[in-house]
Amino acid sequence: MAAPLSVEVEFGGGAELLFDGIKKHRVTLPGQEEPWDIRNLLIWIKKNLLKERPELFIQGDSVRPGILVLINDADWELLGELDYQLQDQDSVLFISTLHGG
């Protein structure tokens, strides 16, 4: 069984507006059978942090196109995207690159 993890989740570029305007969240993910990965984190975020308009953040089982994801300041595409296994004290940053005009 995977132990609970403490992770910093941050939203920027306007994405924080979907989370009551709160940019930084220090969360404890509960222990579970399988290791925590980004796919599971997104499900947890949708259930526990996302306050409105989930379609602006989630598309299918991933983030919407136009949302940049950084894990410990590295592009998630270099780390396996949804399959990246979270480690205790990881930092995950979601930045919306879509802006109205």
From Swiss-Prot:
GO cellular component: cytosol; nucleus
GO biological process, one term: tRNA thio-modification
Record carries keyword Cell membrane: no
GO MF annotation list: protein tag activity; sulfur carrier activity
UniProt KW Plastid keyword: no
Pathway per the UniProt entry: tRNA modification; 5-methoxycarbonylmethyl-2-thiouridine-tRNA biosynthesis
Covalent cross-link Glycyl lysine isopeptide (Gly-Lys) (interchain with K-? in acceptor proteins), where: 101
Keywords: Cytoplasm, Isopeptide bond, tRNA processing, Ubl conjugation pathway
Subcellular location: Cytoplasm
Modification after translation (UniProt): C-terminal thiocarboxylation occurs in 2 steps, it is first acyl-adenylated (-COAMP) via the hesA/moeB/thiF part of MOCS3, then thiocarboxylated (-COSH) via the rhodanese domain of MOCS3.
Annotated family: Belongs to the URM1 family.
Protein name: Ubiquitin-related modifier 1
UniProt source species: Homo sapiens
